[in-house]
From Swiss-Prot:
Keywords: ATP-binding, Cytoplasm, Glutamine amidotransferase, Ligase, Magnesium, Metal-binding, Nucleotide-binding, Purine biosynthesis. GO terms for cellular component: cytoplasm. HAMAP family: PurL_1. It is an enzyme of class 6 (ligase). This is Phosphoribosylformylglycinamidine synthase.
């Protein structure tokens, strides 16, 4: 083992955070220094030249001053016996650089801890420095050799039921966490006695996963008796009733990994069989899926949320015969945050068990995990919600603590699929059964069964064993394979595909062959395996991520294999399909068959559940408002996390990748996160698209189960009504149900809620629920040490509805931004509560530690339908200037958020509304506030009247020029604050979370910027005509210069880049680095080259650096690239990851001596922003005629800080005239202030060119915003093109 010292691993503020945690734990630590340590396992010794090459490979990241280490060593490495995702990618890079003797390279962090610490205190510090789920600690470097040990395979065991009977299996059930019900134990004993043998542990694990509540949804399929009366339908049948009543536009429901609805016809953009990107006119259907990943997120929030998103993405990709995930959503419900130093008056501490983390930890790490996976995979995350609730209340079961110690972690999204791929094909006998994706590792074992238990029923080791790990770059490679398959149309080699989720291969392969009407013979040792010491059940049942199972016909296999090799996606043929429905898993190592079962024993005839339950009634207590002050209530509500600003959850997630995002969360020139819904364009040549929104009112279930469900459905509609969708038939719903099954009253309540929407509301509205998910163990129980009394926190019955819709014109989406540039306007409240003002389970009740008695409800489905249809008429006719639904926090919050987005004052008169001031301002009845031009008032009122809304529509106010938010009742002022006062209160939660999680200096700068009353917001200044197509004369010649759209494994922004160059008149050619390294393509044939954005090699060895070094240290590749850059008829562009890559290649590129390196952002966080930049005077072929222009652009990167050697180097770059693009503030001044400069680069530098202008690199993404509609905000006068299209047309003009 070769040990190589690496660069410092922690910045100053990261060290300070560790020291602060040590001080909180009263540990006498005076200093901590950390640096990376690399460990190389070699098959033969390296020459001195090879070792130098390896050392250069392992030199990466920002320049931080090195120290001479002092103090006690705590070496943190990946857990021995595992291969980390970092190692697999770093090893790939080493091999691509010719270092074949490197069997594996791993990375650790060497912490040097100073201070007078005894052994116990050092152990406590060690616990703070590592994650026991994925890491191990050592006291000396030599111990890292354990990383490369290879254990002998362990044998399977069996449970002796032939002699021990039922009792033997019952004991094993508890010890191994199978979560088998009593009748399932009986069923297994009976069947194995029939087979005349004992069950192997692998068979029991497999059965437990395949038949867990998580996988088989036993409660939703159960028969029900409530209060002694048999019920006519199961829960699932009531959901299916919505489809039976309204099947229109549903192409697939209930039978696949995701549901599919009718989409739009447009030009799908992807490479043809010759590799040139082109439009393919076809129906682009919409697929939808929403999952939850609650149990793992309570144990390990980052990995739990990351793998939740990853599993949902795989569900989408594995729909039909392969499809394309497009846009994501994420949501969290947790108990009270109790941010230290920022605790709120309603946040009581009811304790928690030691095995789960705090709500604050979940909301610190969980969103980062979900965002990181989506970012690296390349899916924009455009929608979400965040709710906190934890309170002792009197509900259906009397006085008890209700909250979310077991959190809700929601992961979902939409995608697209070809019509002829919606239905899975037949699996031919003899078809190859393939595992696509990563290797088996001993992680996530028993996840399906563990998540099916109430938290506290399994032991702590099993809880930790049930959490999976994430490798999104691997999943991206797999998706590229799936994409290349579906793009072949009729020649698609995939006959059948499933994702690998709960239960691992032991669930996925049986499901695959069973659904395809076949059986299967499998070879256990053909499964790619990074932990050879695993026992058979661990190999077969582990939940290693980023895997799919597929059936490919023998005649199609060569084509499939070639695609996998080009994309460098790991695959293995594990078995073949058989005509007999039997499952055999052979083990060549031990020469036995660990699994040998008829499929119907595993999947077919397990006992059906029967639920015999009793309903309970709640007697609420009316909300006591006698001591509630209107102003105090407003301040509390703005600090309730459910209502407070969500920027800390949003800017960590890429919202522009694909270049198809038409509406993200951030609204208007001030980028305020208040959007009602998310909207995407179907493709680059159309305005058709897709929308999705969320609806949830979970606390209402504490008073009225059915009303809570109805409110969730209704809120999803009031959120999506601002998009141009048309008929309700164009909307389909996903329903995600969470309940504490078995808790008194909750089962009957669940039945009541499902019936309310499945049998009643959705059929009345014409809505269908073709997809959903349930999680039935939402209760946490524990005993404190030394206390025999059991404690518990039980979640309210929770329904999260996601609405998906086909959009006719994505340009017509209305946002909450109040418009100050449209003349005289009025605000109208449409009150679907019709003046009832019911306050039960409201946010106001929560912040005063009450519950209330009567909740809002959907009293009239017809009125709700009328509201939706009226909004659709007004949206289609462009009569609405702004729209925002009323929800948490009531009218006050709705109006305040609209004012924040519009950067304006507003005056509201509630004189025409019923109820007292508190009820009028803070009730959460359904409805919306719309802004309309006074010149359109008559037309708008006529539409409202035509839809039965006249009597519940009230003109409530208008804008003011005082920058104040004022609520009056007649001549009396009820509430008055400056907009800035309320805006900064609303921002406090996000500031507190950012300051704790990220660089506190950056967090403070962002918070302080919100006090700037005169901030003009994003603005545009152009020195050219953006509608002039300067490439048109060249396109008219018919010549299409070949443009290499270059990508490496993990790159994810190549499609939008190709679309931009295609529009400019180039022949955009798909070029993978493997094409160059293996000689399939040469750069000699191209005039232009663009290195695209993404996460090449998952940013291992530095962002873009691994990609660059695979060129620099590969003689053939180095020669090709150097030759290309030196040809005077070529030009090149690097964007984001491509910018980082080309800047590392600068020794090959003439005239780039002033180029910086691009390293970790100053915030040390991935930054997704819509930032203002200015083009500088520079020689770049891309920016000809654009100097002095100022316009916004998408930014999405974690390592974009331009690092120069020193201040003199910065000055030299500026003096050279090669700086091309700078970040500027909203006043037009170059800036280093965060977040206007999201990475902290000196002088705002974010783009630079070579001295001759032929090579240009920039961190922001022009290719994602070349269409006007893809900009988060743009001036009304922009038509189809944004100003960034000029860049690509300049390149075409340059070629001539």
């Amino acid at each position: 083992m070769l040990i190589l010292r690496g660069a410092p691993a922690l910045s100053e503020f990261r060290v300070n955070k560790i020291l602060a945690r040590c001080q909180q734990s009263q540990l006498p630590v005076t200093n901590v220094y950390a640096e990376y340590a690399h460990f190389a396992d070699l098959t033969s010794p390296l020459s001195s030249a090879e070792q130098t090459k390896l050392e250069k490979l392992l030199t990466y990241g920002p320049t931080i001053a090195e120290h001479t280490p002092a103090g006690k060593l705590v070496l943190v490495t990946p857990r021995p016996g595992t291969i980390s995702p970092w190692a697999s990618k770093a090893t790939d890079i080493a091999h691509n650089c010719g270092l074949k003797q490197v069997h594996r390279v791993e990375r650790g962090i060497a912490y040097y801890v100073e201070g007078e610490l005894n052994a116990e205190q050092l152990l406590q510090v060690t616990a703070l420095l590592h994650d026991r789920m994925t890491e191990a600690t050592h006291s000396q470097f030599e111990d890292a050799a354990q990383l490369f040990r290879s254990d002998a395979p362990r044998q399977m065991s069996s449970v002796d039921i032939l002699s021990g009977g039922r009792e033997a299996l019952a004991i094993a059930n508890v010890e191994q966490g199978f979560a088998l019900a009593d009748d399932e134990i009986d069923y297994l004993v009976e069947n194995f006695i029939k087979l005349g043998r004992n069950p192997n542990d692998i068979e029991l694990f497999m059965f437990a996963q395949a038949n867990s509540e998580h996988c088989r949804h036993k409660i939703f399929n159960a028969d029900w008796t409530i209060d002694g009366e048999e019920q006519p339908k199961s829960l699932f049948k009531m959901i299916k009733n919505t489809f039976e009543k309204n099947p229109e536009n549903v192409l697939s429901a209930y039978k696949d990994n995701a549901a599919v609805m009718k989409g739009s016809k447009a030009g799908r953009f992807f490479p043809n069989t010759q590799g040139e990107y082109a439009y393919h006119q076809e129906d682009i259907e919409i697929l939808m899926k929403v999952e939850t990943h609650n149990h793992p997120t309570a144990i390990a929030p980052f990995s739990g949320a990351a793998t939740g998103s990853g599993g949902e993405i795989r569900d989408e990709g594995a729909t039909g015969r392969g499809s394309k995930p497009k846009a994501g959503l994420v949501g969290f419900t947790v108990s009270n945050l109790r941010i230290p130093g920022y605790e709120q008056p309603w946040e009581s501490d009811f304790g928690k068990p030691g095995r789960i983390v705090t709500a604050l930890d979940i909301m610190t790490e969980g969103p980062l995990g979900g965002a990181a996976f989506n970012n690296e995979f390349g899916r924009p995350n455009l929608l979400g919600y965040f709710r906190t609730y934890e309170e002792q209340v009197t509900s259906h079961n009397g006085l008890e603590v209700r909250g979310y110690h077991k959190p809700i972690m929601l992961a979902g999204g939409l995608g697209n699929i070809r019509t002829d791929h919606v239905q899975k094909g037949e699996i031919p006998v003899g078809a190859k059964l393939i595992a696509l994706g990563g290797p088996a590792m001993n992680i996530g074992l028993g996840g399906g069964a563990a998540s099916s238990m109430a938290s506290g029923q399994s032991n702590e080791d099993l809880d930790f064993a049930s959490v999976q790990r994430e490798n999104p770059e691997m999943e991206r490679r797999c998706q590229e394979v799936i994409d290349k398959c579906w793009q072949l149309g009729d020649e698609n080699p995939i006959a059948f595909i499933h994702d690998v989720g709960a239960g691992g291969l032991s669930n996925a392969f049986p499901e695959l062959v069973n659904d395809g009407g076949r059986g299967g013979k499998f070879q256990l040792r053909d499964i790619p395996n990074d932990e050879p010491g695993m026992a058979p059940h661990e190999i077969w049942c582990n939940e290693s991520q980023e895997r799919y199972v597929l059936a490919v016909g023998v005649e199609d296999f060569d084509r499939f294999e070639a695609i996998c090799k080009r994309e460098r996606a790991q695959y293995a043929v594990i078995g073949e399909a058989t005509a007999e429905p039997h499952l055999t898993v052979a083990d060549s190592h031990f020469d036995n068959n660990p699994v040998d079962l008829p499929l119907d024993v595993l999947l077919g005839k397990a006992p059906k559940m029967h639920r015999d339950v009793t309903s309970k009634q709640v007697v609420g207590k009316a909300l006591d408002v006698t001591n509630i002050n209107v102003a105090d209530a407003a301040q509390r509500l703005l600090r309730l996390p459910t209502i407070a600003e969500k920027t800390f959850l949003i800017t960590i997630g890429d919202r522009s990748v694909t270049g198809l995002v038409a509406r993200d969360q951030m609204v208007g020139p001030w980028q305020v996160p208040v959007a009602n819904c998310a909207v995407t364009a179907a493709t680059y040549d159309t305005y058709h698209g897709e929308a999705m929104s969320l609806g949830e009112r979970t606390p209402a279930a504490l008073l009225n189960y059915a009303a809570s469900a109805r409110l969730a459905v209704a809120e999803s509609l009031t959120n999506i009504a601002c998009a141009n969708i048309g008929s309700l038939e164009n909307i389909k719903l996903s329903a995600n149900w969470m309940a504490a099954a078995g808790h008194p009253g909750e089962d009957a309540g669940l039945y009541e809620a499902v019936k309310a929407i499945g049998e009643e509301l959705c059929p009345a509205l014409g809505l269908t629920i073709p997809v959903g998910k349930d999680s039935m163990s939402m209760k946490t129980t524990w005993k404190d040490e030394g206390d025999s009394q059991e404690k518990s926190v039980t979640s309210p019955l929770s329904l999260i509805i996601t609405a998906f819709g086909r959009v006719d014109d994505v340009r017509k989406t209305v946002t909450p931004q109040l418009r100050t540039d449209k003349g005289e306007t009025s605000l109208i409240l449409v009150d679907l509560g019709a003046g009832k003002n019911r306050m039960g389970a409201s946010s106001l009740a929560q912040v005063y530690k009450q519950l209330g008695d009567i909740t809002p409800d959907v009293d009239s489905p017809e009125l709700l339908k009328g509201f939706y249809n009226a909004m659709q008429v007004l949206v289609a006719d462009s009569k609405l200037l702004a729209y925002h639904d009323r929800s948490d926090g009531g009218l006050f919050t709705t109006v305040a958020e609209m004012a924040f987005a519009g950067h304006t004052g507003v005056t509201v008169d509630i004189n025409g509304l019923t109820g007292n001031d508190i009820e009028a301002l803070y009730n959460e009845e359904l409805g919306a506030v719309i802004q309309v031009a006074n010149s359109d008032l008559d037309a708008v009122n006529a539409v409202l009247k035509d839809h039965g809304l006249a009597t519940i529509s009230h003109i409530i106010g208008t804008l003011n020029s005082d920058d104040a938010i004022v609520f009056n009742r007649g001549k009396n002022t009820v509430l008055s604050n400056t907009r800035t006062e309320l805006r900064t209160m609303w921002a406090e939660t996000t500031y507190q979370m950012q300051a704790r999680r990220d660089n506190p200096e950056c967090a403070k700068q962002e918070f302080d910027a919100k006090f700037d009353v005169k901030d003009p917001g994003l603005n545009v200044k152009l020195n050219f005509d953006l509608n002039e197509d300067i490439a048109a004369p060249y396109i008219a010649t018919g010549a299409k210069p070949p443009m290499a759209i270059l990508r490496e494994q993990g790159v994810n922004s190549h499609l939008e880049m190709a679309a931009a160059f295609n529009r400019a008149g180039f022949a955009a050619i798909d070029v993978h680095m493997s094409d160059i390294l293996e000689g399939r393509l040469s750069l000699e044939q191209f005039k232009g080259l663009v290195a695209c954005g993404g996460f090449s090699y998952g940013d291992v060895l530095g962002a873009g650096e691994g990609w660059a070094k695979s060129i620099l240290f590969n003689d053939m590749a180095r020669e090709q690239f150097q030759s290309f850059f030196h040809r005077e008829d070529t030009f090149s562009l690097g964007v984001c990851n491509g910018c980082q890559m080309l800047s590392t290649l600068k020794e090959l590129i003439p005239g780039t001596e002033h180029w910086p390196r691009f390293v970790t952002n100053k915030s040390e966080r991935f930054e997704a922003r819509f930032s203002l930049v200015e083009i500088q005077e520079n020689p770049s072929v891309f920016f000809n005629g654009m100097a002095g222009s100022r316009m916004p652009i998408a930014v999405s990167h974690g390592e974009g800080h331009a690092e120069f050697a020193n201040d003199n180097a910065v000055k030299a770059a500026l003096d050279s005239g090669t700086v091309a693009v700078k970040f500027v503030d909203n006043y037009g001044n170059p800036t280093t202030q965060y977040p206007a400069n999201p990475n902290g680069s000196p002088e705002g530098i974010t783009g630079i060119t070579s001295t001759d202008g032929r090579a240009t690199v920039m961190m922001p993404h022009p290719e994602r915003v070349f269409r006007a509609v893809a900009n988060s905000w743009h001036p009304d006068e922009w038509r189809e093109d944004s100003p960034w299209m000029r860049m690509f047309r300049n390149a075409r003009k340059n070629v001539g």
